[in-house]
Amino acid sequence: MRTSFTRLHLSDNYTTVIEKYYRKGEHNFLIFDSMGNISGSIPELFIKDTIKNNTQDKSVNQMMSQKLANVSPDDLLMEVIELMRNEGVAIVSVSENDQLVGVLDRNNIESYLRLKAE
């Protein structure tokens, strides 16, 4: 789980997403509304498509996925992987006592599994 992650907002321009993608090394992002609630996500696939098609002039609100999933820090990794696959999400929020404590994304999980296999 990553406890340090970028919070993008509905009104952000997609160029902001691309900048964070390249500078921060994050691949998938959660999107928040003005009240701090999670509104959606932007998976790496969307970012790559936007770069390829040169459609960065849109807002995050126009380009995000509304598919969301939430897990607990106590959930088993295999359960999280199955949930992500079933729900079609690349990033999940991790909450404890109704508080967002981090995120897990496909890239984090794949890196962890590769390291564990070595």
Q: PLM features: residue spans?
A:
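Bateman (tandem CBS) regulatory domains
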Residues: 1-5, 15, 43, 56-68
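Cytosolic, membrane-proximal regulatory domains of ion/volume homeostasis and mechanosensation machinery
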Residues: 12, 25, 40, 45-61
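Well-ordered, non-transmembrane segments within structured domains
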Residues: 30-31, 36, 43
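Short, functionally important structural connectors and interaction interfaces within domains
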Residues: 34, 55-56, 63, 96
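Glycine-rich acetyl-CoA-binding "A-motif" of GNAT/NAT acetyltransferases
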Residues: 38-41, 100-103
